[in-house]
């Protein structure tokens, strides 16, 4: 293990890298946008870059492009940020690029939310439909809710209903909402249960289901499915017993956010960045 210093960022460099995760934390300062970039091999490689724009990333990785370590990277996991994809293809020539499924599911839920809001706005605020879409929207998104619970008396509806009955009432409000919800559920189950081989076989079927639904709020999500098809399928590959994702990196973001809050009194941006990186690297992190 070697301690390397490059352009104000101190980080740990591991010679046998097999997995790389790209994510970032943005903090607005008086002088610039402060970005933290996390790389995670067997032991975390943590560094700080002042920008995540494509030009700067090219400038940074040019320092390393002749290094054999870049060829040891097998997988690169990222959110759907195009410059990350372009940089990874250029510098990690032997690596498979994977999209973190968390970001894709988040995008999908945001699209369904837009459908809900569009339908909601077509009803008066004192209507039953508005009440259901506003009060019980959680039933569309939270898959941890036990739908077949014991029914309770609902004053607004004037009868006993359980969560499943409420969901059925919501989905009956508009065909677009019902179709959008069913597509969301179908993709969520596909994402949670498919193997890599099953993902390769079934992805295009689900993709065309979204297209054939003709739901305008899903247009951006469909574009993401199209532009990131191979990277989404690659995310179903199992690495060290788990699907490839950046969940560990995202949890690290919470730690760094706390450190950022605790170092508000340090006005020198460079010193603040170095202290945060030192604090994170001092304890060390392992992917279990």
How would you name each of these model-derived features?
Residues 2-4, 13, 21-23, 72, ...:
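Compositionally biased amphipathic helical and low-complexity segments enriched in hydrophobic
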Residues 1-13, 115, 279-283:
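Short, basic alpha-helical nucleic acid-contact segments in DNA-binding proteins
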Residues 5-29, 36:
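Two-metal-ion RNase H-like nuclease active-site motif
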């Amino acid at each position: 293990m070697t301690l390397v210093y490059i352009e104000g960022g101190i980080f740990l460099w591991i010679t046998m890298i097999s997995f790389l995760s790209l994510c970032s934390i943005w903090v607005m300062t008086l002088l610039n946008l402060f970005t933290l970039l996390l790389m995670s091999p067997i032991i975390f490689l943590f560094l700080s870059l002042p920008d995540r724009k494509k030009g700067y990333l090219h400038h940074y990785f040019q320092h390393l492009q002749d290094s054999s370590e870049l060829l040891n990277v097998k997988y690169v996991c990222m959110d759907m940020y195009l410059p990350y994809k372009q940089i990874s293809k250029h510098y990690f020539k032997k690596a498979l690029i994977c999209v973190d499924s968390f970001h894709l599911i988040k995008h999908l839920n945001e699209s369904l939310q837009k459908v809900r809001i569009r339908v909601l706005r077509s009803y008066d605020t004192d209507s039953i439909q508005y009440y259901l879409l506003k009060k019980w929207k959680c039933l569309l998104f939270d898959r941890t809710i036990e739908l077949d619970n014991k029914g309770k008396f609902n004053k607004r509806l004037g009868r006993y209903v359980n969560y499943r009955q409420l969901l059925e009432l919501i989905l009956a409000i508009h065909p677009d909402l019902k179709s959008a919800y069913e597509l969301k559920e179908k993709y969520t189950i596909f994402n949670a249960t498919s193997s890599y081989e099953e993902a390769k076989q079934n992805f295009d079927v689900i993709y065309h289901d979204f297209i054939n639904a003709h739901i305008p709020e899903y247009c951006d999500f469909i574009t993401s499915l199209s532009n990131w098809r191979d990277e989404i399928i690659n995310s179903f590959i199992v690495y060290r017993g788990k699907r490839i994702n950046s969940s560990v990196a995202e949890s690290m973001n919470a730690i760094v956010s706390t450190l950022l809050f605790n170092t508000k009194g340090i006005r020198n941006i460079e010193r603040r960045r170095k202290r945060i990186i030192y604090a994170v690297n001092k304890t060390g992190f392992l992917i279990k």
